């Protein structure tokens, strides 16, 4: 439940689901509860699983964080033959020193990372291999399983010989590339005034421009109600080619006419139609077989 994974509980509850997330560092769970991205915390895996099952049975929207290593949660789900509808992972698997090996508390991991980083790396890679195998087993049992861009599969295959690690797809070929194919990508803006009202003013302009897009309308209305700003107030949404230009010109007009209190900074995201050549993420499984090409 770090910088990226921390968004997932709220994403799931915004779509009226039940989220069960493992996080080894308890303070991260507390932070997500404080910022309203997460609903409940458990320290016991079975209690967390039972709470998630109860919520699903009663069609109650709920997000749960359990203080444990991800592999321990996955193993317990398998032991109890509980198959999640959807399964993914956002641990820091791209960096062996940020990933937390099994059988260590967060505090023990911090000490080992400082005193013996090479042993730490090897333990991390061992756990990554176990992690991928558990995900593959849950996929085999029916869970819709995908990689969320942290290179967990690549680490398990390249450094621990898990040859079938890529049997579950990355999220880009599985879900995002159809959006890329029509030029749709993330469009984000931040209010330098620090006043949330400036973002709400921009939101309204986007609603006026793109009221015919039900997904965008739903997102903007829900985001205002449920997203807690961190740092400068900001918003992100997905717009298609040409729409981003319309939105930017409309926001520029708000600045020019003084309808917002200060400048609005507009940015893009590395996850985009013409972004990076990353064979295990943005350019995975390119149709022409050339996953080293950044755009097509």
List the model feature ranges, each with a label.
Residues 3-57, 90-133, 169-178:
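Catalytic or ion-translocation cores adjacent to nucleophile or general acid/base/metal-coordination motifs
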Residues 3-8, 27-31, 70-74, 93-97, ...:
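Flexible loop/turn segments at secondary-structure boundaries
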Residues 15-18, 58-61, 82-84, 140-143, ...:
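Short coil/turn connectors at secondary-structure junctions
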Residues 22-23, 67, 89-90, 146-148, ...:
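Generic beta-strand/beta-sheet core signal
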Residues 63-91, 98:
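Active-site/ligand-binding-proximal alpha/beta "capping" segment
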Residues 64-66, 127-130, 137:
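Polyanion-binding loop/helix "lid" in catalytic or ligand-binding cores
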Residues 131-293:
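Glycine-rich, aromatic-lined ligand/substrate-binding cores of catalytic
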């Amino acid at each position: 439940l770090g910088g990226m994974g921390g968004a997932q509980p709220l994403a799931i509850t915004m779509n009226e689901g039940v989220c069960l997330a493992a996080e080894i560092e308890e303070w991260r769970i507390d932070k997500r509860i404080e910022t309203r991205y997460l609903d409940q915390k458990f320290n016991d895996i079975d209690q967390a699983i039972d709470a998630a099952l109860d919520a699903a049975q009663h069609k109650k929207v709920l997000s749960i964080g359990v203080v444990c290593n991800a592999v321990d949660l996955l193993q317990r789900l398998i032991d109890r033959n509980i198959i999640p509808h959807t399964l993914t992972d956002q641990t820091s698997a791209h960096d062996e020193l940020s990933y937390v090996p099994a059988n260590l508390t967060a505090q023990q991991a911090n000490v080992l990372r400082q005193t013996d980083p090479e042993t730490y790396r090897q333990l991390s890679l061992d756990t990554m291999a176990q992690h991928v195998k558990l995900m593959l087993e849950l996929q085999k049992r029916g869970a819709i399983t995908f990689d969320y861009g942290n290179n967990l599969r690549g680490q398990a295959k390249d450094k621990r010989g898990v040859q079938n690690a890529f049997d579950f797809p990355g999220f880009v070929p599985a879900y995002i590339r159809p959006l890329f194919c029509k030029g749709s990508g993330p469009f984000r803006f931040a209010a330098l005034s620090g006043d949330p009202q400036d973002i709400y003013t921009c939101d309204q302009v986007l609603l006026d421009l793109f009221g015919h897009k039900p997904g965008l309308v739903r997102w903007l209305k829900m985001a205002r109600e449920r997203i807690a700003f961190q740092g400068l107030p900001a918003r992100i949404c997905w717009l298609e080619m040409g729409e981003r230009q319309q939105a930017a010109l409309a926001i520029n007009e708000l600045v020019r006419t003084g309808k917002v209190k200060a400048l609005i900074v507009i940015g893009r995201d590395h996850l985009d139609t013409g972004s990076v050549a990353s064979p295990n993420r943005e350019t995975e499984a390119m149709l022409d077989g050339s996953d080293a090409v950044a755009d097509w």
